[in-house]
Regions:
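Bacterial N-terminal signal peptides that target proteins for export
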Residues: 2-13
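Residue-level signal for mature regions of secreted extracellular proteins and peptides
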Residues: 12, 18-19
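C-terminal motif of bacterial Sec signal peptides marking the signal peptidase cleavage site
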Residues: 21-24
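Beta-propeller domains with acidic blade repeats across secreted/periplasmic ectodomains
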Residues: 26-391
């Protein structure tokens, strides 16, 4: 298989400026806060991002909401504060104080962390997931300028970096759900690897909720029935077109989704699938495509988009890294009717991959805002985009 070499869009100056801006308040070391800084206006931020090349359905518009180096997972408080995890060592908060749909201030909440990809908000506290540890910042919205010292909630997750980024979210049961990816492309690891775990907010009650999951970096609960849905990335090195990434549904604990024995519900693994029957595992609800790298996903509960998008599922495709012809680099949407039937995903935001190999962005996560707009994080460009709709 040929590894494709991508052409980097010229944006070094923009990203360097963002790094200087965000790095100007480094404080006195790791895990310290810094005073807020004014963010440039939206028209300035969007300059150089080739947003004219991003294709959306009629009536939708995309703009740059904020520049955040290595931006990954997103979460939002009920009051609208946006929290951003990264693949670097920092965690940020963004506020829109005048409610004009543009980021007004950016706060650096913590630094010196080990890939703090995951962020989740509950009862005034921000939970942060690094490779092996869950931290908590209490009463964070009243302390953005001077963040508190992190409290260790749970520190017994594996330290493996392969598939070590952790997306986290609180479920309807009040537990914090935390994935543990397989520490490999394909292997037969023991617990807790290749699973989705959950713990109570205080770090007690560790439990493996589901198994047979290679690497999920996005999940959400369906607003219609409250059931858990998640993406899972298929294994590599079986060719360009198999196996597919998966969209899975886990309505109850104890389900096994097949890894490493069976992929996409119907392909036995050539090494570990011998003697296994794919019918013994839970198949995906949807096959999302091979190597598209399906990451963040959210059900849309807002009212800012047309009615047909109510309860629709948005999925960020980070894009392939080793496919002969690149795929992904987009956001797709699967509409859902009132009975809970989910349609096949179709393109929603495309254009970060052009001319076969010209990459100008890599979507990671999607997050609806209280005003009904949709945020998209991009760790390749160090940006967060905002999608709005108007007739």
């Amino acid at each position: 298989m040929v590894r494709h070499k991508f052409h980097l869009t010229a944006f070094t100056g923009l990203l360097a400026a963002a790094c200087l801006y965000l790095g100007a308040c480094t404080g006195n070391g790791s895990r310290t806060g810094c005073p807020p800084e004014q963010v440039a206006q939206d028209t300035t931020l969007s300059a150089g991002f080739e947003l004219d090349s991003i294709h959306l359905p009629p009536g939708f518009r995309i703009s740059v909401y904020a520049l955040i180096p290595d931006a990954r997972s997103l979460c939002v408080s009920p009051s609208g504060t946006v929290f951003v995890g990264t693949r670097g060592d920092k965690v940020y908060a963004i506020t829109d104080e005048n409610h004009d749909g543009k980021a007004d201030k950016i706060y650096r909440l913590a630094s010196g962390l080990d890939a703090p990809n995951g962020v989740a908000f509950r009862n005034g506290s921000l939970y942060i997931a690094t490779i092996s540890t869950i931290f908590r910042l209490d009463s964070i919205e009243s302390r953005l300028e001077h963040p508190p010292s992190p409290v260790v909630v749970y520190d017994r997750y594996p330290t493996d970096r392969h598939h070590g980024y952790k997306f986290i979210a609180f479920g309807p049961d009040g537990d914090l759900y935390v994935p543990v990816g397989a520490p490999c492309n394909i292997c037969e690891p023991g617990p807790p690897y290749a699973s989705l775990t959950r713990i109570r907010p205080d770090g007690t009650g560790f439990e493996i909720f589901a198994t047979g999951i290679r690497n999920t970096v996005g999940f959400d609960w369906n607003p219609i029935d409250g059931q858990l849905w998640f993406t899972d990335n298929g294994r590599d090195n079986l060719g360009d077109d198999i196996p597919s990434d998966e969209l899975n549904n886990a309505p109850r604990p104890g389900m096994n989704f097949g890894y490493p024995y069976c992929h996409q519900g119907d392909i036995p693994d050539p090494e570990f699938g011998k003697g296994k029957d794919c019918r013994d595992f839970t198949p995906p609800v949807k096959k999302l495509g091979a190597h598209v790298a399906s990451l963040g996903m959210r059900f849309y509960r807002g009212s800012g988009f047309p009615p047909e998008f109510r309860n629709a599922l948005f999925i960020a495709e980070h894009g392939s890294w080793n496919r002969t012809v690149p795929v992904g680099y987009r956001v797709v949407v699967a509409r859902q009717d009132d009975s809970g039937h989910l349609a096949d995903p179709v393109p929603f935001a495309t254009g970060w991959l052009r001319d076969g190999d010209h990459v100008s962005g890599r979507p990671v996560d999607v997050q609806p805002l209280p005003d009904g707009s949709l945020l998209i994080s991009d760790d390749y460009r160090g940006a967060i985009y905002r999608v709005t709709y108007s007739k």
